Amino acid sequence: MTEQTIWVGAVAYDPKVVTIWEGMRHYFRHEAGVPVEVVLFQSYEAQVAALLADGSTVMPRVDIAWNTNLAYLQSMEWSARECRPLVMRDTDLGWTTRMIALAGGAVASLEDLRGRTLAIGSQDSGHAAILPRYFLDQAGLVADRDFRLLQFNTDVGKHGDTGTSEADVLRAVLDGRADAGMVGSPFWAGVQARKLVPAGAVADVWSSPPYSHCMFTARPGLDADVARKFSEALYAMNFDNPAHRQVLEAEGLRTWLPADVGGYDSLTDACHRQGHFLRPA
């Protein structure tokens, strides 16, 4: 094992996160030979603060954080880009936001939103709130001017990871409180795969341009060799290995990839425009 323990932060948005990181820690320590310890947080705000902590206060400090796209971008912005993106999942590429509406209803395109009600998710969800508002603005559709907004601020602090606010959006579309709703493509794919709504009842009427989701992010000043060993251990996980597959499937991927920062431009612009880069006091 390397001598330096690597402290990794993750947000416990679901009980399965404990199981995932028990498996990840076991892999790192007992197979990859990398001494990792895990700190679980209740919010991404707390995790980002720990990633940026300088060690001069009693605040916990982590070396690497498993961040959402919003938390990754905030880490970069608030560290003057001294944080470093490391590794992401294959499934973090190519996310989209989908607008859903009752099949055969009044909304079949973005333009049909004029004068109607749109449901969106939690205010800190990139895929269910921040990017939907951004893409609508780009299309010339402004909330409270061109359409009414029904927002579900459920599980704020989890950045939409729980999917609870997206479930609220779907319910609002089904019961008529909203004419349409915005959800992330993985949530919508899950609804369809599990047949959670009657076949043909709800239609996917619009898709956003693609963007990227999560990113392992290194703190400012983390030794490059430490970051490399952590990253290489992730790359060595093999989906064909049953022990690895159990953890990989739980985390929703087949393989780990080097950081590809090209899929964050739209969210970066949205965060600047909507004030998500204003650092908490």
Locations of regions flagged by a protein language model:
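Flexible hinge/capping segments at coil-to-helix
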Residues: 101-118, 122-123, 143
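Extracytoplasmic small-molecule ligand-binding "clamshell" domains
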Residues: 1-73
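An extracytoplasmic/periplasmic, membrane-proximal ligand-sensing/linker region
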Residues: 2-10, 15-23, 211, 218, ...
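A ligand-binding cleft/hinge motif common to bilobed small-molecule-binding domains
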Residues: 66-80, 137-138, 167-199
